[in-house]
Amino acid sequence: MEGKIKIGPVGTDYSGKKTMVDWDEGSHNGIISQIFLSHGPTGVFSIQFQFMLDDTFFLSSCHGQNTGSMFDVILLNCPHEYITGISGEYLKSDGASGPQIRSLAFATNLNQYGPFGGSSSQSSIWNHEQQFRFKLGKFRQFSGFYGTYNASGLQNIGVYLQPTIVKPTGTRNAEETESNIVLG
């Protein structure tokens, strides 16, 4: 993806296994209107997105299976609400069965959603769980998700960031500011 920064993925890397399915939703413009999650006490089983492009809505493929005991829909106030971060927990053990992405939470410029999936009240030390947090800034820089899944659930997840050019709002240039700081 030209001009985009690929962040992650977090989770387990089973790249040599034939049962893994790679997915990539980074070619969209990053304007997500809905996120669909199947999850349960052991983690996230599937994730799916609805994107908006030129006032038309497109549904992505379902990445995983909707076999969790819980299903949630995150409805964003599109196009005014946009993703500014993603966080959660993943299992850092290549031999474990089940979803390796244990929980997911999403931050937008307007709200916080989640966590969805396994309870963080379980001991992370004994379960080999690791926390992650991708903060994408306060501007609309999110550009998509990617990851892998298998029959057990979501195995890893990452995000794309499209850097935004931000111009300084002050009238002074950097040299003037620096000289005022140094000289008082």
Curated annotation (Swiss-Prot):
The gene is JAL2. SUPFAM superfamilies: Mannose-binding lectins. Residues 4-163 form the Jacalin-type lectin domain. Belongs to the jacalin lectin family. It holds the Pfam family Jacalin. This is Jacalin-related lectin 2. GO terms for molecular function: carbohydrate binding. The keyword Cytoplasm does not apply. SMART domains: Jacalin (SM00915). Keywords: Lectin.
